[in-house]
Amino acid sequence: SLKVAGRVEAPAAFCRGAVRSVYIHGLKADHLLYNYEIDGETVPDPYASKIAGREKWDDERRAECDFLVCGSFEEKEYEWQSACCPEIPKNEMVMYKLHVRGFSMDSGKKGKMRGTFAAVEEQIPYLKALGVTTLELMPVYEFEEIEIPKKQKLPGYIPQGSLPEKGSETEKEKLKVNYWGYAKGSYFAPKASYGYSKNVTRELKH
């Protein structure tokens, strides 16, 4: 379980328009996880550059307990200014749209590399041999692939114990999986379960 290191208030005095900001001295972000509390509900930062808690694909343990997904930070600042575009003319472009996990699960790789950005990268020579110049990736931002039913609070007039308990036969059905990823997500964070290395951002950029 996670231990709460501290709680930082963001009062109205720190508000500029619809944005509230605070500066915290002396924090080292290397191993820091954080969330927001908005109107009593704990939620991850929608602009987080990294999400912790979904490193394993289709891990149903996230549905079996009150699993907490948190915002996190990259070890090093993401360098984007040095990146350059191939600038392939549109009339010469051959585009291939793929799903990172689906495309690379049967790539001949074994173990943890299957279904990752690294496995896709190793298939680039094959794609080039086909004449492909450009890849369009299906969602690679962080999203919850398991369709976890929302927990509803029981009204007072329903007796305790009248509904099936957690883990009963009626609740052991396989949860549905949003394989493609077209859903609400953390659009600034690469999907952790698609990463082979610890630094999934750098792996995707590479």
Please provide the spans of the model-predicted regions.
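The feature marks proteins involved in alpha-glucan
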Residues: V19-K97, G102-G115
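Extracellular/periplasmic catalytic domains that process cell-envelope and extracellular macromolecules
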Residues: E87-E92, K128-A129, W180
